[in-house]
Each structure stands twice: as C-alpha cells, then as structure tokens.
C-alpha cells in the first residue's frame, strides 16, 4: 500500500525510498515485530480467558508436558495478524505472487483455527476431521498451484527446476498442479508435526523463510538470476517483503513462546506458516530446494510416516515416540537441549540450500 507513495516522488526525495524492496522489507519487518511485542500480551490474556483450560495435553505424551496444562493455544493469530498488516502496508498489492502466498497462508490458518477451536472446546487432542482438513487444504493448494502456473512466464509454466544443474527443467505438464499440492500440503503438515516443543517450530520456520527471501529476491532480479544461472521469475522479489513481515511477527511471537511458553502457536500458526513456505517455494520455482532448506521438517514428517508404517507391519516401533523430537525427550534429553540443537540443524540445512544458488 505504501508503495503508492512513490507517485508523490520526483525521483530524489524520501518517497523514492518506497520503490526499493529492501527498504519496504525493513518497514514490514519492524511493523510486524512491534505489532507482536505490543499486542502479544493482550492476545494471550484474551485467549486465556476464552479457553479457560487451554490446549489439551495428550495422556500418552512425555511426562514433562503435563506441566504445560492450561497454556492457551491459537497464538499463531499473533503472527498472522502481524504479517498480514506488515504485508498489506509495505508490499506492492498489484503483485499476484504476494496475493497467492498471503491467501494460502490465511487459508491454511483458517483450517488450523477450526482444528484448534475443536480441540479446545472438546478438550481433546483430536480436532477437525483429518479428511476435512485434507480436502480443504487440497483445494487451497490446487488453486495456488494453478494460479502460480498462470502467472509464471510461459517458458517456466508447468516446469520443475532442478537445483545444481544450470537451465535444467522437467516439464510436468498436467502433473504440475498435483505436484504443487504435494509441496504445499506436505510443507504445511510437516511444520505442524514439528510444533511440539516450546519455540521448536518458529525458529526453523523463520530460518527457512529468510533463506527463501534471498532466493525470491535473486530469482526476481534479472541481473542476479543471470549471474547465478537460475531461472528468472519476474515479480518474485516482492515476496521478500512478505517474508520480512513473517519473520518480524515470528520474533514477536517467540518473545512469548520461549520456554516456558506463555502461549502455543497451535495449528492456526503451524499449518499457516508451513503453507506459506510451500507456496513461496512453488512461486519461486525452488520446490526441491525447500526439501533441503526445510530438511528439519522433512525429517520430522518422515519419522511419523516410518513409525506408522513400521508399526502397522510389525506391531513394533522404530522410535520411542514420534515425531522424532519426542523420541529424544523419551531418551532423557532436556526440552531446551532438543530445541536449540534442532535450531542449529535448521540453520546448517538452510545454508546448504542457499548454496544451491551458486553450485550449478
């Protein structure tokens, strides 16, 4: 919205700054951060009054989780409000890619909110029906994939870009939209599975998002794209503003989610943020790189898949408990120890993912 102030510029004054993505990204970051700081406590107090008993704790979970009883959930609302306000104020609203990612984020947030609401009202860990969640998420992801394919340059529409290889594309044809559904749904649910300890999910999400802000800026700039040998996707640089707002809102949330958490993100936040990462990967044509940058989420999701399949086949478990962060809890690792080590892993994987920009 504030980008339109450039119409008041004569080319050398303050209003000219609004032309620059980096300036507006900084504005979006601080807007979202301050929103999170100032409105975090009032939101937590409101959630505590409305939810009374807070998020239900599983009886079969790690014993130390029983001390978290009464902690309110749906804290993802704080991140979502902050990033939405930051994006609407500072991003170019005539950019279709921004709207795709923002609407995917809010769509998955709505699914998560309904799920959290069901859990809180029934005081049971089983919320919204899995089939309903899957169906709505599939529709949102399919619409996003189709919109991205329509907006992409003709030479890239329906194509899958391969990292490490210059100008390597695989034409997916009619399989492109189903593939984008897999990416977006997979990312949303993987982040959702990771959100099981105080502060565990939000930092890796911000790290992955920061990595994709660099990717979006590079592939959206013809000079950088040509230098790095990546595919040029005009307009994606504007997603750096969205990501900056996400990180600002995420930090504001982490202020209250740091151990011991005063509020949980809930499915409201985890599904939304995962969906956002998936949508950004699709828009920037770096879907495979997301599996590297977000490798921590992949491992968490795979641990659940392996556990379920192995148990159905043998009646035994591979892990003491899945997702894998609970396995380490059962082995005696402290919560802070697990969280910080997973943050370190997320940072290392993000750096490896960014290296794919040049290694080709």
Curated annotation (Swiss-Prot):
<dbReference type="Pfam" id="PF00953">
    <property type="entry name" value="Glycos_transf_4"/>
</dbReference>
<keyword id="KW-1133">Transmembrane helix</keyword>
<keyword id="KW-0808">Transferase</keyword>
<comment type="similarity">
    <text>Belongs to the glycosyltransferase 4 family. MraY subfamily.</text>
</comment>
<dbReference type="GO" id="GO:0051992">
    <property type="term" value="F:UDP-N-acetylmuramoyl-L-alanyl-D-glutamyl-meso-2,6-diaminopimelyl-D-alanyl-D-alanine:undecaprenyl-phosphate transferase activity"/>
</dbReference>
<feature type="transmembrane region" description="Helical">
    <location>
        <begin position="288"/>
        <end position="308"/>
    </location>
</feature>
<keyword id="KW-0812">Transmembrane</keyword>
<dbReference type="GO" id="GO:0005886">
    <property type="term" value="C:plasma membrane"/>
</dbReference>
<dbReference type="GO" id="GO:0008963">
    <property type="term" value="F:phospho-N-acetylmuramoyl-pentapeptide-transferase activity"/>
</dbReference>
<feature type="transmembrane region" description="Helical">
    <location>
        <begin position="168"/>
        <end position="188"/>
    </location>
</feature>
<comment type="function">
    <text>Catalyzes the initial step of the lipid cycle reactions in the biosynthesis of the cell wall peptidoglycan: transfers peptidoglycan precursor phospho-MurNAc-pentapeptide from UDP-MurNAc-pentapeptide onto the lipid carrier undecaprenyl phosphate, yielding undecaprenyl-pyrophosphoryl-MurNAc-pentapeptide, known as lipid I.</text>
</comment>
<feature type="transmembrane region" description="Helical">
    <location>
        <begin position="239"/>
        <end position="259"/>
    </location>
</feature>
<comment type="pathway">
    <text>Cell wall biogenesis; peptidoglycan biosynthesis.</text>
</comment>
<keyword id="KW-0573">Peptidoglycan synthesis</keyword>
<feature type="transmembrane region" description="Helical">
    <location>
        <begin position="337"/>
        <end position="357"/>
    </location>
</feature>
<keyword id="KW-0997">Cell inner membrane</keyword>
<feature type="transmembrane region" description="Helical">
    <location>
        <begin position="71"/>
        <end position="91"/>
    </location>
</feature>
<dbReference type="Pfam" id="PF10555">
    <property type="entry name" value="MraY_sig1"/>
</dbReference>
<keyword id="KW-0460">Magnesium</keyword>
<feature type="transmembrane region" description="Helical">
    <location>
        <begin position="263"/>
        <end position="283"/>
    </location>
</feature>
<feature type="transmembrane region" description="Helical">
    <location>
        <begin position="134"/>
        <end position="154"/>
    </location>
</feature>
<dbReference type="InterPro" id="IPR018480">
    <property type="entry name" value="PNAcMuramoyl-5peptid_Trfase_CS"/>
</dbReference>
<dbReference type="GO" id="GO:0008360">
    <property type="term" value="P:regulation of cell shape"/>
</dbReference>
<dbReference type="GO" id="GO:0071555">
    <property type="term" value="P:cell wall organization"/>
</dbReference>
<protein>
    <recommendedName>
        <fullName>Phospho-N-acetylmuramoyl-pentapeptide-transferase</fullName>
        <ecNumber>2.7.8.13</ecNumber>
    </recommendedName>
</protein>
<keyword id="KW-0961">Cell wall biogenesis/degradation</keyword>
<dbReference type="InterPro" id="IPR003524">
    <property type="entry name" value="PNAcMuramoyl-5peptid_Trfase"/>
</dbReference>
<keyword id="KW-0472">Membrane</keyword>
<keyword id="KW-1003">Cell membrane</keyword>
<feature type="transmembrane region" description="Helical">
    <location>
        <begin position="20"/>
        <end position="40"/>
    </location>
</feature>
<dbReference type="GO" id="GO:0051301">
    <property type="term" value="P:cell division"/>
</dbReference>
<dbReference type="GO" id="GO:0009252">
    <property type="term" value="P:peptidoglycan biosynthetic process"/>
</dbReference>
<keyword id="KW-0132">Cell division</keyword>
<dbReference type="GO" id="GO:0046872">
    <property type="term" value="F:metal ion binding"/>
</dbReference>
<keyword id="KW-0479">Metal-binding</keyword>
<keyword id="KW-0131">Cell cycle</keyword>
<feature type="transmembrane region" description="Helical">
    <location>
        <begin position="199"/>
        <end position="219"/>
    </location>
</feature>
<feature type="transmembrane region" description="Helical">
    <location>
        <begin position="93"/>
        <end position="113"/>
    </location>
</feature>
<dbReference type="InterPro" id="IPR000715">
    <property type="entry name" value="Glycosyl_transferase_4"/>
</dbReference>
<keyword id="KW-0133">Cell shape</keyword>
